[in-house]
């Protein structure tokens, strides 16, 4: 059990730092809509981490485009993450579009 809670805290710390790093990036596509880092699932050895993001896009910007921007900036985000968290090996980041909120909105519309 202690291992899982430690990994959960590490995932949450990584998520918070990624949110801060993305917030400082200057790409207008990232600030065009509402971008949310939903969760992070890091490997036990921190070799990689899946970052699930949700996006309510603005006009002219698609969620796939935003995920593409994040994937291209993954190297920068990874190096900044390692610097801020003072970890020896920062995980390789894989950004994945989390469509859970879009699915929930769709179900909500069907119920109404």
Regions found by a protein language model. Name each.
Residues 1-48, 54-112:
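Charge-rich, low-complexity N-terminal segments
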């Amino acid at each position: 059990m202690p291992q899982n809670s430690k990994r959960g805290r590490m995932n949450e710390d990584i998520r918070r730092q990624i949110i801060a790093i993305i917030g400082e990036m200057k790409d207008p596509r990232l600030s065009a809509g509402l971008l949310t880092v939903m969760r992070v699932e890091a490997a036990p050895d921190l070799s990689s981490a899946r970052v699930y993001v949700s996006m309510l896009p603005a006009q002219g910007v698609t969620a796939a485009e935003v995920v593409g921007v994040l994937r291209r900036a993954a190297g920068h985000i990874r190096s900044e993450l390692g610097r801020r968290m003072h970890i020896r090996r920062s995980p390789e980041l894989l950004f994945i579009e989390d469509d859970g909120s879009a699915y929930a909105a769709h179900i909500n519309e069907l119920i109404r």
